[in-house]
């Protein structure tokens, strides 16, 4: 579906936004949960935010709420802008590194996402892909978010968070349902439930005070490809030179950081 300004929604052939790809049957968190189960007991600490990273004489000390952990290397896997806002680095990061991090926008950091759940994926029965691009909004894209075989049935969309500033999840959900009605007909107007997340308000996703100059131009910057002070490795998806902003980018950045640490360890 394509929704143009002042022209309403119209059906177009094919799928305008979704290409051939793979999806996690039980959500992307399934990968993280599976990997977490393979870690040694006590290796993973939840609800334990890092407050300070100190590099001194070849040793990295990471200070968190639970105490201090030392290592030879540290991997920063959160968005750089969030890292430099929330973590005190000592010695301070080089000026060019800090400036780059502050100016690197968090992918989807200023976005509201909504998932409308239905009893069945009725749009498939009438030959619709469940995908839409809208220039009228407030949601700019809609995707079929259903599980294997269409169950559970769901449509997902995202919109800029700024227009919803101060809105409740219920109000955002209602706006999404109204737009789905315009796009996919009356059956879309009454979802069983709408899940809403404002990523701009998530403490560990978006900085509390994003830089007004934040942009995606810093994605995959050369400074992210090598460790700062030889010990601090940047591995969020924004730092990836390949597919930045996507899961593939996060995997690529994590692999790059791991390889760099292995090389440094073997050479020590």
Per-segment meaning from a language model:
Residues 30-38, 115, 175-182:
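Amphipathic alpha-helical segments that form well-ordered structural scaffolds
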Residues 59, 110, 126-268:
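Conserved flavin/dinucleotide-binding core of flavoenzymes
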Residues 17-28, 43-46, 67-68, 105-109, ...:
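Aromatic-acidic/polar surface patches that form glycan- and anion
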Residues 44, 50, 60-62, 71-76, ...:
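A generic "structured core" feature
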Residues 12-16, 90-100, 209-215:
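Short glycine/proline- and charge-enriched loop/turn segments
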Residues 49, 55, 64-125:
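Central helical "cap/lid" subdomain
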Residues 1-49, 77-87, 139, 212:
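Active-site/ligand-binding neighborhood in enzyme catalytic cores
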Residues 38, 81, 121, 183, ...:
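Phosphate/oxyanion-binding loops and surfaces in catalytic or ligand/nucleic-acid-binding neighborhoods
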